[in-house]
C-alpha cells in the first residue's frame, strides 16, 4: 500500500541519517572549532586588544594570571607603569606596584583624572614574562604560524608533485635516479635537515617558509609517482597517446586531475605537520625570531 511504501522510504531515510551521524561523529563540532580559530587568527588586527610585542611594564606586569585588570599610568617621559591600586594625592599620584607603594608627581603623569588615571589594561588570558598580552600574541602568532604552514605546504607539494610526475613519466633511468635521491633524503632525520638549513640561511619568516617547504616534499613525490604510474596505463591515457598528444598535455589534462584526491588529502595533513615543525623550531630558538609572536616561541 501507499502508506507502507511511505513508511519504508522514511525508515530508509532515517536509518541513512543515523549512519551519517555515526560516521561523522563529532567531526562537525571539530570543524567548527577549527574554523573559529582560523577566523579569529585572521582577524587578529581587529580582535587583539593590544600590540603583541608591546612590553608596558616588565616589573609589575609580568606573569599575570588570566583576568587581571591593572591601572595603566602613562609617563610623561614615555612608556607605562602598571599598578594594582592607584590613589590620587594633592601633589600627584600614589600607586601600588610590585608589592610596594610608590609616589609620582603630577608632572610625571599624562593621564591623570580626579580619581586616579584614565587607562586600564585587562589581561584576558594573562601576561608573559615580559608583560606582553598573551591573547594578542596568540592571535597574531596563530596567523603567522598558519601562514608559514600554508605557504610551506604550497612549496613542498609543488616540488613533490613536479619531481614525482617527472620520475613516473620520464623513463626508467630518470625514475631510478630521482627515487634513490628521495630515499637518501628520507634517511636523514627531518629536524637535522631543518637545523642545518636554518644555520646556513638568515633568520626570518620567509627563510623559515623556504626551509620547511624544501625539506618536506619527499613523501609527496612518492605519492605522486605511485598515482601517476597507476594511471598512465589506463585506457583513457592510451587513447590520448593514440591522438598524438604530448606527454605534458596528457599529464596535465588526464593524469593529474585523476590523481588529485590522494594528493589533496596528503596536502591537508602536511599543513598541520608543518605548523608543528615551525612551532618546534621556534621553541628551540631556530624559528621565528623574538619578539615577533608565533605559537612556537610562545611555548618557549
List each model region and its residues:
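Gly/Trp-centered helix-boundary motif
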Residues: 5-157, 161, 165-166
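Alpha-helical transmembrane segments of integral membrane proteins
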Residues: 127-300
